[in-house]
């Protein structure tokens, strides 16, 4: 008999009224049961919170938290991750679309590892999009210098969070990938299971000043 794992989906929202319905629908329609959807809103000024509350009326596994002050993308995710209660956590961007078998296939892949990532295909609204269907190099030395595994592609054991240091200098998905690599291992699910939306208001990654020094310091290297 197959054990049904408790899956927490963690999403951070901010002014996502245009796309968040599509992503919530793709999560709620997953072929694998979703224990809870944790949404941490960073004080949206549009109708994002109202839309989420509409979904909460129909789905009691959606839990909304609204920050008392703006945190920004990375601190917001770190706060949201701590609220997850499932033994596995999947990260969701508010404007992506999941393939309906995403969680089912990642759960099948992750056994024996602490983090599984899928491939993503980007699409855009009026901006140049790309397709990334290659499995990246997840060697720890490669991970030290660039987050080759985006958070929106991850499913990981909750235990990984206990190995993440508190820092404002390193992005959350890089911290997760490094911790999983060092404590249990990373495996790829080599299928495109996430459609990653690219648009002019989407968050983009840039390295902070003194990044290379910071990444070694937070893991005490």
Task: Please report, for each region that a protein language model flagged, where it lies by residue.
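Acidic helix N-cap motif at the loop->helix transition within catalytic regions
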Residues: 19-21, 46-54, 101
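Glycine-rich, basic loop-to-helix element that forms the pyrophosphate-binding segment
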Residues: 67-84
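Short aromatic/hydrophobic "clamp" motif used to bind/position activated sugar donors
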Residues: 89
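Conserved donor NDP-sugar-binding/catalytic core segment of glycosyltransferases
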Residues: 97, 101-130
